[in-house]
């Protein structure tokens, strides 16, 4: 579509029903502020210019809305005098002369580009106003879209509707597109002669028709038009978002054994033929390649799992974790800023932080990379095909050469050459009969305490 477009996103509400110390549009859905989801939808509709109408937490909202490729102009709404007044807070941006003006809301994070594109197409086809509506089997409380001969003749609010009009199930979402060349003139004609003394954007339908303009409506899925005002509604939106994204991934070839227990982030990438077991949580920045297996109760954030690698169960991958092809991070392991080479194994009860592990190496149970001295982080480097015995502590900075062996229970503080065996533990001593003496002494002490009372 060659037409220019400005999206006006209304995000200046006081968010009183959210009962929060911050604006509701800053609350996350799938690990991302809901306002950013709205900007992403706008960008997907081919719109690169946004007038963001802000009020509460203006700077934070503008920052959260910033995504690559979209120019954001923040417009402060000092008073809350209705939706029509809110759009006019972006007067200067609108006056720049766009073909289309698209009005949407910062608290509707499930919207996608489809209805937005359809509304813009309606303008291209000659409409002056295009309202986005949705069909619902629960229309009570919504304004009804009344259509005749293909044109929208009115938006009838519930309190003003006749019994016949209340049977209409096509409802107003609040989103609309406006002919950019006529937008300012139409918006400035909105009056406030109503009980609340506010300026309502919906009045544009009547105004445009009174001037001989054409007004139409397009449809959107009800779920996409779900707004968020309370914590309960936020939970519903999160559920809807997760269900939609899980379904998309499964259709793309990802296996989820119990999808309702898997939680994704806005940018989670999972390749074809990956297997995700129950109760897995993906934080932002997780990339799972094809054929990888994520076992149950794992948490992955800011990490990359390569083809054929396995994670978990009960594993945690933190930012900077990078697992090579066919590698393994097993149960009760944590990896942070660590690269696990191809085919390397970190099977259980291990912490790998600020480390590089070469291909084919084996890290025994209970191994710890001691990467922090209380002030600075240091790196541990383990070569290829090395063997780290169980319950070893590798005190960084330290390098273990290719093919080296570390004996179980060792504390390694110095570099170990390739193919060397390193032992860093006290020599075992055996004292025959000593256990019996110790046991007798302990029992005597216990009896003496009991006798005293």
Swiss-Prot record:
Q: Which cysteines are joined by disulfide bonds?
A: none
Q: What does the entry list under GO cellular component? A: cytoplasm; membrane
Q: Which InterPro entries match?
A: Bifunctional_GlmU, GlmU-like, GlmU_C_LbH, Hexapep, Hexapep_transf_CS, MobA-like_NTP_Trfase, Nucleotide-diphossugar_trans, Trimer_LpxA-like_sf
- Please state the Enzyme Commission number of this protein: 2.7.7.23, 2.3.1.157
The source's domain of life comes to Bacteria
Q: Where does Mg(2+) bind?
A: 107, 229
Binding-site residues, UDP-N-acetyl-alpha-D-glucosamine: 10-13, 24, 77, 82-83, 105-107, 143, 157, 172, 229, 318, 336, 351, 362
Give the source species. Rhizobium leguminosarum bv. trifolii (strain WSM2304)
Question: Record-annotated residues binding acetyl-CoA?
Answer: 365, 371-372, 390, 408, 425
Q: Write the protein's name.
A: Bifunctional protein GlmU
Family per similarity comment: In the N-terminal section; belongs to the N-acetylglucosamine-1-phosphate uridyltransferase family. In the C-terminal section; belongs to the transferase hexapeptide repeat family.
Please name the top-level EC class of this enzyme.
transferase
What does the record give as the active site? Answer: 348 (proton acceptor)
Tell me a GO biological process for this protein: cell morphogenesis
Tell me the segments the record calls region Linker. Answer: 232-252
